[in-house]
């Protein structure tokens, strides 16, 4: 037993000081430390102040809050993994304590998968918004909280069945490396989420096409200004959620395919177990997404708002010069005379 433990300690030492592994650890820590204030600013200064309906705002707040919490957890995980090699006195001290690993591992994976589930709520809420555009703005904020609960609760159930028989008796130097027992099932769960996210992205694209035709049909009718405003807000918010869904799909797809590809290629492809474990420990896609999504959100909101203001100016601005200005002036005078004449009858 002592010999086996010493072998694991030697392996932990070799992996921890591997240059590629160390570089990936510091990269993840750096982007996570930057992501925390960026996400907090975006959440408090942008998401909470969005003019969207309360149902969508509830989903967005939950979505970005879960990403923020995941970035916080990664800050703890990778601070530990980056700093411990500088202060340990024995090789075996590099192995994470069983209880600490269990808490850090479960929390990390839970907040990794939770933001992957919430975009399904975006699609459901958007379809309801388009279908009830004429009165959606007056509806209570009820659908959003219900969708948040329905989408997050199954994640607890999945994790319970994945890890209920896991004893966490193996040795680990990374909080994100899966134990062998639930690894296959968790990878299948990731594949399911990836396929579902691809389908969800396609649904978002169909929704935007349908909404465009739906809006054009409504605008041809004599609809009220409030309905026109609601249709425009639904269009902008749907485009924003589509950008979020696509960005998340790209980074999560890279993470899922990369992680499963490493396991599929196996130790023989990487030459030895050391290189294989290093490849398993390099997970930079999702932590990088945590940082970039705040900037993607800021830029996309700024562009959508500028386009909306430009569209409003082109449609609402009344010309006051030239022949068109003269016609507009005559129309306004005639409307005033008609109003006065109707009152005197």
Swiss-Prot record:
Which segments sit on the Cytoplasmic face?
44-57, 125-142, 211-241, 302-345
A single GO cellular-component term from the record reads: perikaryon
Keywords in alphabetical order, please: Cell membrane, Cell projection, G-protein coupled receptor, Glycoprotein, Membrane, Receptor, Transducer, Transmembrane, Transmembrane helix
Q: What GO biological process term is on the record, naming one? A: sensory perception of chemical stimulus
Q: What does this protein do?
A: G-protein coupled receptor. Plays a role in the navigational capacity of sperm and promotes the targeting of sperm derived from males to the fertilization site in the uterus of hermaphrodites.
How this chain sits in the membrane, per its record, is: Multi-pass membrane protein
Write out the transmembrane intervals.
23-43, 58-78, 104-124, 143-163, 190-210, 242-262, 281-301
Q: Which residues lie on this side of the membrane: Extracellular?
A: 1-22, 79-103, 164-189, 263-280
Q: What family does this belong to?
A: Belongs to the nematode receptor-like protein srb family.
The keyword Amino-acid biosynthesis belongs to this UniProt entry's keyword annotation = no
| One Pfam family per UniProt | 7TM_GPCR_Srb
Task: Give the molecular function GO annotations.
Answer: G protein-coupled receptor activity
Write the protein's name.
Serpentine receptor class beta-5
Alphabetical list of PANTHER family matching this protein: SERPENTINE RECEPTOR CLASS BETA-1-RELATED-RELATED, SERPENTINE RECEPTOR CLASS BETA-5
**Where in the cell?**
Cell membrane; Perikaryon; Cell projection, Dendrite
How would you summarize where this protein is expressed among tissues? Expressed throughout the head.
Q: Which residues are glycosylated?
A: 5
